[in-house]
């Protein structure tokens, strides 16, 4: 409100951090594979810190949009290497569990921001919130540098010197990734999930504010809806660990999101706000099995171990495209309809595409690192 942002502009602001991912996600994955996983995470956190510092002095919506795009680059460098890094640090029998936990990062971060953001802005203003984010990002970069072993430490100095890992050119890794069916399928499936999840969760404060709820109440309800997504992702990791078929988990997630979105926004529940909110909670919670499943699949459908970050980068690129386009599209439909009652049609269409693509997902394990 302080910057005079319209609803559609708010949709783009919500998704602008995904601009970098939509344009260069796979290339950021190539960069992470090339410069080293740990270095990439540290660089991403440093970019977060710089972008947050810049946000303190933003005075126009256009400048904030540009800053969010720059922040998106840091997001890519920070998150794309993590599945591959987890694969190197965790024993194979516990890999699915840990990747399920990693799949909660977006929902957890969103919930923390929604719970703590309004409180901090009330105390320090939005400039103070940006400053705090800069400090947190800088501290996280320092923690990774101090606590996560480097590639040389993980491989062993002697082994790295006497038996160096063969390298492939970035172009070769890119070609290998984009000519394989597996990375394409999980990338499209992820985009169908992320587009509707961010659109629904991101606009819940506006939906509830229009219904007459206070900003604090709307923020708390939205934060809880975001946080329950964590349960689905963790459950996916545990179920995969026990041998449940990944394809069946994807089916469960998309079918549940379709049904619950209809209950949350359709005309049949217009006079049942409690039922609508319970449907939103189920939309997010059961839908959470999708990212938990996909992050686990990414390390298996990658053509080889040296293309895991590139595969995750391509998955993130398609996901970012969905997150960039989903919120503005839902806002546009809401503007035409004069309300949110047709939101379920957009989420239902995304789920249908996700189901069709997920039906062809097959599991293969990447070649081991030499």
Predicted regions, residues:
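Cytoplasmic helix-loop-helix junction between adjacent transmembrane helices
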Residues: 67-108
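Extracytoplasmic gate region of multi-pass secondary transporters
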Residues: 182-223, 230-233
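C-terminal transmembrane helical hairpin of 12-TM major facilitator-type secondary transporters
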Residues: 246-294
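Conserved MFS/SLC helix-loop-helix module at the cytosolic interface between two early adjacent transmembrane helices
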Residues: 23-59
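Cytoplasmic membrane-interface "Motif A"-like loop-to-helix N-cap segments
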Residues: 34-44, 241-256
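Helix-loop-helix hairpin linking two adjacent transmembrane segments in secondary transporters
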Residues: 101-149
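A late C-terminal transmembrane helix in Major Facilitator Superfamily
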Residues: 305-337
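Residue-level signature of mid-helix packing/kink "hotspots" within the transmembrane helices
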Residues: 18-26, 110-111, 226-230, 234, ...
């Amino acid at each position: 409100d302080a910057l005079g942002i319209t609803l559609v502009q708010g949709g783009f602001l919500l998704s602008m951090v995904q601009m970098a991912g939509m344009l260069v996600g796979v290339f950021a994955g190539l960069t992470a594979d090339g410069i080293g996983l740990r270095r990439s995470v540290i660089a991403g956190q440093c970019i977060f810190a710089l972008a947050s510092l810049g946000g303190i002095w933003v005075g126009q919506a256009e400048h904030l949009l540009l800053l969010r795009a720059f922040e998106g680059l840091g997001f890519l460098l920070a998150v794309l290497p993590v599945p591959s890094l987890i694969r190197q640090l965790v024993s194979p029998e516990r890999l699915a569990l840990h990747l399920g936990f990693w799949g909660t990062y977006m929902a957890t971060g969103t919930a923390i921001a929604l719970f703590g953001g309004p409180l901090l802005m009330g105390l320090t203003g939005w400039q103070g919130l940006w400053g705090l984010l800069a400090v947190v990002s800088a501290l996280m970069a320092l923690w990774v540098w101090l606590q996560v072993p480097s590639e040389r430490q993980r491989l062993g100095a002697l082994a790295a010197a006497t038996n160096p890992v063969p390298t492939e050119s970035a172009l070769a890794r890119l070609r290998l990734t984009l000519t394989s069916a597996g990375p394409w399928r999980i990338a499209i499936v992820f985009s169908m999930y992320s587009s509707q999840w961010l659109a629904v969760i991101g606009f819940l404060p506006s939906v509830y504010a229009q219904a007459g709820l206070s900003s604090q109440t709307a923020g708390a309800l939205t934060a809880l809806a975001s946080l329950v997504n964590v349960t689905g992702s963790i459950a996916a990791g545990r179920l995969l660990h026990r041998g449940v078929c990944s394809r069946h988990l994807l089916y469960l997630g998309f079918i549940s999101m379709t049904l619950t979105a209809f209950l949350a926004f359709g005309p049949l529940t217009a006079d049942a706000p409690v039922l609508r909110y319970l449907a939103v909670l189920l939309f997010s919670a059961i839908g959470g099995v999708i990212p938990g499943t996909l992050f686990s699949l990414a390390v298996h459908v990658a053509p080889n171990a040296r293309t895991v970050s590139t595969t995750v980068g391509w998955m993130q690129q398609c996901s970012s495209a969905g997150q960039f386009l989903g919120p503005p599209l839902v806002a546009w439909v809401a503007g035409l309809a004069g309300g949110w009652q047709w939101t379920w049609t957009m989420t239902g269409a995304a789920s249908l595409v996700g189901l069709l693509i997920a039906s062809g997902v097959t599991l293969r394990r990447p070649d081991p690192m030499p």
